[in-house]
Each structure stands twice: as C-alpha cells, then as structure tokens.
C-alpha cells in the first residue's frame, strides 16, 4: 500500500524533459505561452476564490489541480477560463467549503466580464454554463485519477520556521513566497513540497539578509526538512524563481501593496554584482505594484501589520552561508499572523484552513530546536499583530450585550407571569375550583421551545379559574389537579390532637437546629400524584422514572423533592417536622394546626445564580426515616386503603400542598417573596369558615365532604412513608 502511494505521488512530479513535451507543447503552444496560461488561470482562481470567500488553502488546492490537469490535457482543448471555475468548484468541496454552482458561475462571469450584467438563471446560456461546468468537473476528476489530497509547501514552511525559531518577517516572507511559487512557477510539478518550502525559505533569507545558523549537530537547517536538499539545489532553484519573476508581466503579479516588501524599498544601497542587483530589483518591482489591496488580502490571508524595514541583500552568493548577522525570535511570536493550516500527521491531508500547529511534528521540533537554540543570538523584538480573544470580545461587546438584554427580558417576563399567577391563586376566593395544568416534558409540546430559549427551567403553569362547574378536560400530556375547598364540618374532629403535635414538633425543632436545612429539602414539598419536568439544576436521566404515576410513594416524593429542592436548597423555612405534618394527615388536623396563625412568613428565596454549590443529586442529604415512621399510627387511624399514588383514589390534594408547590416554583424561577407576610388571608377567612351552599353543590359530584382549605401558617411537617 505504501509503495502504491509513493508511485502515485511520483506520478505527479515531472522532469524538465517531460515539461518541455507537455500536451500543450505538442499542440503548438510554446513554453512561455504555456506558463503564461498557467499564471492567468491561477490569477482567475485567486480572484474567484476571494469573491467566493473561500480559504487560501482552497485556492491553492485548485491551482495545483489546474497545474496537474494541464500536464495531461492541452490548453487548446480545454480553455483555461472554462477549466478554472470547475477546478475551484471541486477544490471547495474537497476542502469542506462547498459553494453553490450558481454562485461559482456568477462569480466567474463577474471576473471575466465585469462590464456585463449577470446572466438570467433561466436563460439558455446560463443552463449551458451549468452543464459545461459539471461536465468539466467530472473530466478533472477522471484526469487526476481522483487523487484529490494535496500537500502544500506552506505546511513545511510553517514547520521549518518554527523549528529554527525564525523571526516574524522571515516567516511571513517565506510563506508569501510559497504562495508565489504556486501562482507563478511550475515548481509544484517538479519538486516535492518540502523542497519547494526550502527554496522559499532560502530565497527569503537571501533577500532579507538573514541567516539561519548551523545546528549543534553540524547540520544545516534544510537537512531537517528534506535530506535530499543541497545548497547547490537551493541556489539553482532560487535563480530559476527569480528568472520567472522577471519574465512575468506585472498584471499577473497578484502580490501587491504588501507593507513588508514596500518597506524594503528604503533599504540602504550595498555593493553587489549586477546580476544580483537585477534579481533584487525584480523582487522589489514585483512587490511594489500599486494596485488593489483586495487581491493581496486574499492571497496572503495573514496579518501584515507593523513589519519592520528589511535589510538589503548580501554582497555575494557565498555570503548567504557565512553571514554573522542573526535575528532570532521565539517561534510563537509570528504564529498568530500566519494563515493557519490544518494537517493530519500521516498524510498531510487538510480538511480546513486552520493548521493545528500544536500537532506539528513534535519529534522534528524536539530534535532541532535545542540544536538551533544553542546558536541563538540576541533576539530582536518584533511587534506581534495578534488579535487576542479579549480584543475580539471587545469588538463584539455591543452585539453580545444586546443579545443578553433580550434574554434577560424574556426571562423576567416569564418569571413575572409565574409570580402574578401564583399570587392570584393564593388570594383567590375559596369557592372557585383551581385547575393547575403542568405539562409533562415532551417534545410534542409546541410551547416548550419558546420557554427553553428564555429559561430552560421554566415550568408551564396555567391557572384558569372554573366557575364551579367541571373544568374542560386537559391535553393528554398535561396533568389536572383539582384543589377542593371543603366545609367546616370535618375540621373539628382532632383539634386538640393536632395542636399537641404541633407543639411537640416545635420542641423537636429546637433540639435539632442543625438538621433543619437538609431535612427540609426532603420533606417540605411533597405532591404524590403530580409530575413536574426537571429544572436545569436537577435534570437527570432518572427523573422520568421517578415521576411516573405508577411508581411507589418513596420514589415519587424523592424525585419531587430532588427536583424542587435542588434549586432552593439554601433557603430557611419553618420547623421541619411541621413542614410535612399536614400533607397526608387528616384534613381536620390540617385545618386546626394552621388556624392558630394566619400570617405565612417566607424569607427571601435564593436565585439560581446563588446556588452554584448545590448538586441536583439529593442522595447525600440526610433522610430522617425514623421520624417519619413515628407518624404511621396517625396515618392508619385517619386514612382508608391507599390508592396507586399513596392516598384514596378520590381524595384531592390539600390546599397546603398547593401553597408549598407554588412557592417552590417561585423559588425555582428566582422570584423572591418579601420578608413580610407574603399573602394576607384574614379578609377571606370568614368565607372559608362559612362556605356558601353553591360551592358545596358544585362539588357534589365527588365522594369527599366539602372542607375549608387549610390556611398555612408554616410549612407542613415531614411526610410519613407509605404503610407496607
């Protein structure tokens, strides 16, 4: 397999004789004309790529496709301006930046015919262009043998300049020359990418009067890149590169207005040979073309800000290996200004423009960096053109602030709606039956996505008031809870018993103040046949299991307490034993135990941001099972056989449960009730004591006797377990 791959790689590298005998040459196109056609096609690919907003990597890949294609096909058979859009269309897909066929055709038309209007997409000419481009793409694929993975010299330039800790200017110049070699020469058809990278670095060093020192191992820097490279080969290819640059018309030199090179125009004159003077002047002329900035911006794809003036060329060619002036810099100083490339370790396949520089051949870097590091001389500080994350965030601060304000407004609206609805419910007339609809968490709920955007912990809660009649049936995914208001007849059965128990619980609470906080988390809010979607703090995979209606009472209460208390676990409420006493006790006991105090004090509840340390898993909290078991005899005296949910099938949830549930919901939404008595019940208490006959008759359909609702003075005592 490896040998096959090597043979395939060698297939696309040609000797000078093969280049002189190319298909275009056989059809009568001379060498200079063929090179000019290649440069024009590369020029069009660069222009189109910038307009299509694809990466420089994609443009470079398309240029290599073009060079290889015309080693098999002739320019006389396939026009360069027809083939270039197809090559770019294919390269964009290979490099994972696909563009629409329509966009590619329109951009090609704009580049080739800037004065003409865009073709109508329904016209015959446009449809013919579409068909031609698709056919050409197929021809390119077949001509290339579907070998679409391209290794570029830029990757090796980056690795080598890192290895030798080159300065920012040298790294930028070398990278720039690598792009130049693709646009203007046929080096990509003659030499492997490491060799081309060495030529580009050597040319940059020679022109910039920089020298990369010999390592402590006695090796030259290019030996770490490619062992086959010699100084003679580098000098020969550098001379060839400069000759091509001299012949190339200025209109094809798409390297313009680069400040680093323009600054080189101000270098001091130096004694040198006439041929080298001509060569240097060629580079300077090539670079200092005054034309549009947009072309070089796309070609470079890197920061060119604040590059210092570059020294002149050395006086002789031999001096390129014996100069003493060395300017070294940390390898990281220039990385931020490079157009990043990404390569795989094995085959150099890049799927995006960014190069994971961390993953670049660390073994090579470890071998060479220590050797070159010992030769490092005085460093020259070059200002970095890096754009930091802070600067980027500052640039987009206004946009982020606007989005944040919008989200906060949405969240505040949802919270205010819940608070308003809860206060209406708590202060409502006793003769209205209140229906709470809480949707089970499901993907079919059409109102859920909006709530997720505003506050993902939002519970959907509707509080319509029915006028004594039976409420409209709820949706399949919603659960109804009818809060019944019962008559005063049942509340006198166990007055003394509940008062005594209330006092005992207060005494217990005084003796166990340390257990109050976590004990309340498990026993403050228990709703045995209510299913709540978990909030963001307590969202666990086990919640659907715990909240199923047929589960045991222990699972039900444990799930609900973990769901509700995890978001409000730092608040302090009434005594724990009293917080659960009225939940499953006889209604008469509840009525009496809550009659003694009409005010319901609620301390401020913490918001979600004040609870960073509280886990949604309540398994670590103390669960006072023994104290719950002491309540079992009272349960057996007052209750009938338990139903599927832990109480009688026809028994309704008490009013106290609703109060506790609503305050849990408010705390989960971050709404803080006032320290003063939050709800005043005195004005309507007389109506609870003397319910009207109409309210009783409206509830005659149930088997329970009407009872007045318990008016909460403190949270209910702990919940006893279900009798076996």
Curated annotation (Swiss-Prot):
Q: Where is the composition biased (Basic residues)?
A: 508-529
User: What are the recorded Gene Ontology BP terms?
Assistant: cell division; positive regulation by host of viral transcription; positive regulation of transcription elongation by RNA polymerase II; response to xenobiotic stimulus
Low complexity compositional bias, start-end: 559-569
Q: Which residues carry this modification: Phosphoserine?
A: 117, 388, 494, 498
Give residue numbers for the modification (N6-acetyllysine): 390
**At what positions is N6-(ADP-ribosyl)lysine found?**
484
Motif Nuclear localization signal: where? 253-270
Coiled-coil residues are: 384-425
Q: Which UniProt keywords apply?
A: Acetylation, ADP-ribosylation, Cell cycle, Cell division, Coiled coil, Cyclin, Isopeptide bond, Nucleus, Phosphoprotein, Transcription, Transcription regulation, Ubl conjugation
What's noted about domains in the record? The histidine-rich domain (HRD) region is intrinsically disordered and promotes the formation of phase-separated liquid droplets that enhance binding of the P-TEFb complex to the CTD (C-terminal domain) of the large subunit of RNA polymerase II (RNA Pol II).
> What functional role does this protein have?
Regulatory subunit of the cyclin-dependent kinase pair (CDK9/cyclin-T1) complex, also called positive transcription elongation factor B (P-TEFb), which facilitates the transition from abortive to productive elongation by phosphorylating the CTD (C-terminal domain) of the large subunit of RNA polymerase II (RNA Pol II). Required to activate the protein kinase activity of CDK9: acts by mediating formation of liquid-liquid phase separation (LLPS) that enhances binding of P-TEFb to the CTD of RNA Pol II.
Name-wise, this protein is Cyclin-T1
State the organism of origin.
Answer: Mus musculus (Mouse)
């Amino acid at each position: 397999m490896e040998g096959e791959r090597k043979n395939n790689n060698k297939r696309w590298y040609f000797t000078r004789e093969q280049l002189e005998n190319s298909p275009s040459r056989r059809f009568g196109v001379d060498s200079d004309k063929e090179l000019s056609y290649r440069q024009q096609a590369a020029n069009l690919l660069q222009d189109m790529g910038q307009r299509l907003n694809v990466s420089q990597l994609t443009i470079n890949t398309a240029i290599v496709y073009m060079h290889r294609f015309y080693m098999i096909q002739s320019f006389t058979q396939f026009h360069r301006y027809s083939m270039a859009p197809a090559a770019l269309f294919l390269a964009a897909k290979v490099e994972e930046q696909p563009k629409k066929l329509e966009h590619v055709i329109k951009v090609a038309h704009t580049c080739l015919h800037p004065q003409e209007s865009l073709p109508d997409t329904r016209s015959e000419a446009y449809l013919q262009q579409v068909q031609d481009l698709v056919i050409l793409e197929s021809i390119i694929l077949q001509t290339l043998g579907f070998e679409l993975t391209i290794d570029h010299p830029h990757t090796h330039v980056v690795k080598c300049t890192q290895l030798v800790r080159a300065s920012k200017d040298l790294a930028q110049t070398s990278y720039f020359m690598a792009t130049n070699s693709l646009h203007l020469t046929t080096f990509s058809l003659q030499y492997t990418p490491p060799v081309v990278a060495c030529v580009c670095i050597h040319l940059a060093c020679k022109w910039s009067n920089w020298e990369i020192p010999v390592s402590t191992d006695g090796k030259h820097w290019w030996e770490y890149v490619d062992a086959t490279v010699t100084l003679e080969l580098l000098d020969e290819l550098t001379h060839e590169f400069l000759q091509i640059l001299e012949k190339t018309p200025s209109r094809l030199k798409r390297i313009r207005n680069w400040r680093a090179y323009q600054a080189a125009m101000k270098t001091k004159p130096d004694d040198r040979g006439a041929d080298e003077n001509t060569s240097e002047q060629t580079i300077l002329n090539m670079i200092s073309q005054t034309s549009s900035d947009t072309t070089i911006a796309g070609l470079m794809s890197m920061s060119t800000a604040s590059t210092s003036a570059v020294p002149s060329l050395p006086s002789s060619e031999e001096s390129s290996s014996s100069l003493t002036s060395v300017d070294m810099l940390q390898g990281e100083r220039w990385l931020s200004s490079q157009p990043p490339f990404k390569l795989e370790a094995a085959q150099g396949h890049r799927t995006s423009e960014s190069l994971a520089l961390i993953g670049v051949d660390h073994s090579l870097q470890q071998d060479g960096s220590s050797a070159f590091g010992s030769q490092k001389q005085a460093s020259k500080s070059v200002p970095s053109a890096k754009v930091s994350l802070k600067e980027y965030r500052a640039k987009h601060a206004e946009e982020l602030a606007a989005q944040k304000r919008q989200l906060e407004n949405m969240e505040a609206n949802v919270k205010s709606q819940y608070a308003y609805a809860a206060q209406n419910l708590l202060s409502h007339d006793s003769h209205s039956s209140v229906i709470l609809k809480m949707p089970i968490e499901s993907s079919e709920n059409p109102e859920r996505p909006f709530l997720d955007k505003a506050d993902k912990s939002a519970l959907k809660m509707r509080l319509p008031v029915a006028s004594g009649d039976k409420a409209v049936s709820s949706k399949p995914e919603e659960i109804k809870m009818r809060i019944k208001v019962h008559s005063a007849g049942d509340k006198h059965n166990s007055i003394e018993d509940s008062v005594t128990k209330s006092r005992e619980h207060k005494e217990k609470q005084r003796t166990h103040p340390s257990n109050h906080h976590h004990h309340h988390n498990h026993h403050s809010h228990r709703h045995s046949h209510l299913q709540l979607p978990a909030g963001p703090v307590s969202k666990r995979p086990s919640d659907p299991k715990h909240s199923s209606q047929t589960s045991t009472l222990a699972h039900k209460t444990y799930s609900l307490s973990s769901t509700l208390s995890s978001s409000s676990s730092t608040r302090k409420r009434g005594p724990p034993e009293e917080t659960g006493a009225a939940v499953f006790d006889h209604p008469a006991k509840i009525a009496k135990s809550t009659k003694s105090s009409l005010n319901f004090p609620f301390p401020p509840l913490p918001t979600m941001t004040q609870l960073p340390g509280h886990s949604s898993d309540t398994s670590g909290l103390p669960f006072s099972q023994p104290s719950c078991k002491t309540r079992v005899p009272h349960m057996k005296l007052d209750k009938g056989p338990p139903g599927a949910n832990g109480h009688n099938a026809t028994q309704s949830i008490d009013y106290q449960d609703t109060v506790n549930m609503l305050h849990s919901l408010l705390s989960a939404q971050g709404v803080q009730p006032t320290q003063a008595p939050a709800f005043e019940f005195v004005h309507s208490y007389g109506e609870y004591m003397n319910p009207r006959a109409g309210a009783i008759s409206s509830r005659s359909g149930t088997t329970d006797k009407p009872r007045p609702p318990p008016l909460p003075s403190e949270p209910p005592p702990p919940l006893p377990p279900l009798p076996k």
